[in-house]
Amino acid sequence: MKDNIHPTVYKAKLVCACGNEIDTTSTKGEVVNVEICSSCHPFYTGKQRFVDTAGRIDRFRKKYAKFSK
């Protein structure tokens, strides 16, 4: 490996907006602030909402039906 081309790796602490702190490594710095983490993300907490795409698909098909004929 070449000398002096690799970034410095720090022991970092990810600090989430919800207050959760995670210890990891990073090249960005010693403290990295994030907006969302696994303890507050809706996918991991089970509080995700269902997005109804059926209406959107029907509107798309209706809008572009004239081009398929």
UniProtKB/Swiss-Prot annotation:
Keywords: Metal-binding, Ribonucleoprotein, Ribosomal protein, RNA-binding, rRNA-binding, Zinc
Superkingdom of the organism of origin: Bacteria
Signal peptide start and end residues: none
One family name in Pfam for this protein: Ribosomal_L31
InterPro entries: Ribosomal_bL28/bL31-like_sf, Ribosomal_bL31, Ribosomal_bL31_A, Ribosomal_bL31_sf
Chain positions recorded as Zn(2+) binding sites: 16, 18, 37, 40
Cellular compartments per GO CC: ribonucleoprotein complex; ribosome
Entry note: cofactor: Binds 1 zinc ion per subunit.
Cofactor(s) named in the record: Zn(2+)
Keyword RNA-binding part of the UniProt annotation: yes
GO BP of this protein: translation
Gene Ontology terms, MF aspect: metal ion binding; rRNA binding; structural constituent of ribosome
Role description: Binds the 23S rRNA.
Similarity field: Belongs to the bacterial ribosomal protein bL31 family. Type A subfamily.
Subunit structure, interactors included: Part of the 50S ribosomal subunit.
The name this protein goes by in its record: Large ribosomal subunit protein bL31
Source species taxonomy: Bacteria, Pseudomonadati, Thermodesulfobacteriota, Desulfovibrionia, Desulfovibrionales
